[in-house]
Amino acid sequence: MESTKVYLASLATFKFFYDKDMDIYSIISEFIKDTLYKSKESLELEKVKKYLYDNYNFDIPLSVIKTALNKLIQSSNVERLENKYSLISADDIRRFSEIEISNNDFSVTHQKIIESIMSFITKIDSSYNVVKEDLVNDFFKYITNSYEDTKYKKYIAMFLANDNDSSKVKDLIQQIKDGEILLTGLSYQQDPNEIEIYKLRKNLTIYIDQELLFSSIGYNGELYKEIFNDFLILVNGINNIRNNKGKVLLRYFSETKKDIENYFYAAENIVTRSEIDKIRSVKNNAMRNILTGAIEKSDIVSKKSNFFKFLREKNILEDDSETFESIINKNNYQFNIYTDEMKDRFLLRGNEENDFSNYTRILSMINLIRKGKSSGSLENVGAIFLTAKSALLNLSWDPDVHEKDTDVPLVTTIDFMINRFWFKTQKNITNFKPRSFDIALQAKLIVNSIINNNFTHLFDRLKNDLNNNKKSENDIKLELIALRNISERVSSCSAYEDFTLFNDDILEIEINKIKSNEKRLEYLEDINNELSVVKSELSSLEKENNQLKNDNKDKIIISKSKLKKRNILYFAYGNNIFNYIFNILM
C-alpha cells in the first residue's frame, strides 16, 4: 500500500512541475537528481532506471533517462565517471527537496481522498463493509488502468461522476490523473529526440473495433463521440506535420465490416416489430440509436449507407488486404497466437469460448502485420488494434502474448492513444485538453458502461425465461414493461446519478413499483367512481331545486330531509375531491 501512495504522490508532483512550465526532460531530471541524492553513491544507467522505479514507480525508458542524464552533465549538475553517475553538489539538498516536500504533503491528501470515497460509499450503501487497504489498491488501479475490473471500481467511478461531492478532492485526483497522462506519453519510447519533435519514419496503421467506429458517429452517445473527435483532431495534427515520412492511417478489418453489416441487418429485422418485441430485442445504446426515427427497413439501409459514408469522409477505410486469409496460410503459422494455457486463463475469468476464438484471430492478424516484431517504439511497430473490450485488452497482456514488458502491446485503448498523441505533439494541457483527460467525464462513461452491462445481463436472463417458458404470460408482460422502464433510465444522460441501476435486484424493484402504482390507480379509479355517483345525485337535487324555484318564485321550499341529504352530498363530494388530489400528489 505504501508503494501505491508513493506512486500516486509522484504523479501529482510530476504534474506540479509541469504546471511550472518545466519541459519533460527537466521534470525527469529533478527525479533523477533526487534519486542520486538518496542513493548516496554513484549509479550505473540501469541502476538509475531501477531506483526511479523503486522510489517512485516510474518505468521510464533507458533512452529517455540517458538523454536526461546527458543534459544534467552539460548543466554541471551531474558527473559521469567510469559509466557511473553522481551528483556534483550532493550537499545542496534544497535544490531538489521539492519532490520530498510534495510527496510528503500528498500523504495527507491521499488520506483525504480515500476517506472521502469511503464516506461516499457508506452514504449510498450503509451496509457495505469497506476494506480500506483494498480500496487504496483499487484506487491506484483505477488511476493507472480504468479498464481493469476491481471490487471498488464502480464506487470510485460513482464518486467521481457525482457532481455534488468534494470538488476539491476531485481536483486533487485530477492532478494525479494528469501526471499519469504525462508519464503514459513516455511509454514505449526508444528515440529520445521524438519527445521534442514527433517523427514518423513509416506509416502507423491503427485498426479500429466496431464499438469505437459506432462511437465515432455517436451511436454510443455524445460523450463517446466527443472523445473520438479528440482522437481524430490529434491524428490529423500528426498527419499535417511537415517532413514526416509516415502517416497515421485509420483502418478497420474486413471482418469488422461484416460484423457491422450483420448488426445493421439485425436492426432491419427489428424495426418493423411491435414495441414489446423491440424491448425484447434491443439491449444496448447503439441499437437503440440506429432504430431511433426508423420506421421501415429502408430507413435502416439508408442509415447503414450514411454510416460507411461518414467513415470514408473521416478517412477511416476498410483494409481489404485479406489479412485473415493470410493468417490461416501455412507459411504464416508462426504469427498465430494461441496456447491452451492462455485459453484456460481466459475462460477462468468468466469469458466466452467464442470470444477467445475471435480475439486470438485479431491478435494474430496484428502480429502478422508486424511480422512478429513488437519491440521498439510504438510508432515503429507499424500496427495496433484499438478497442474498448476489457476481455480483449486483458488477453493482449497474457504472458503467452506479451512476453516482454518493453514490447508494444498488440491491442490498446483510445485513451492510451489520445494520451500518447497529445504528449508527442506537445499539446499544452491548458490549451487543448481532450475530453478523455477529464476524470469526471471518464467516470460517467465507466458508470454508464457498468450500468449497460448490468442491463445486458438482465436482458439475457429475461430472454432465457421467455425461451424456456418458465413464467406466465402476465408475469412476462410485467417484466417486459419493467425492462422498458429500466431501459429508458439506462439510456438517460444522467444514468450515472441513478444508484438503483447498480442493484442486482433492479428488475424486482421495478416490478414491485409497477404493481404498487397499479394498486394506487385502482384505488383512484374507485374514488373516481364514487365521485361520479355523488355528482350524479347532486345534479339531480339541483334540478329538483331549480324546478321548485320555478314552481314557487316567492318561496323556495325544500324538504328538511332533502336539504340535509344535499348538504351531506356536498360534504362527501368535497372530501373525496380532497382525498383524490392528496393521493395523486403522494
Q: Where would I find each of the regions flagged by the language model?
A:
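Active-site-proximal, substrate-binding regions of enzyme catalytic domains
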Residues: 2-35, 45-47, 51-56, 62-82, ...
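Gly/serine-rich nucleotide phosphate-binding loop at the start of the catalytic core
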Residues: 41-42
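Active-site proximal loops enriched in glycine and acidic residues that flank catalytic Cys/His/Asp
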Residues: 387-389
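Hydrophobic, helix-forming membrane-interacting segments
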Residues: 559-586
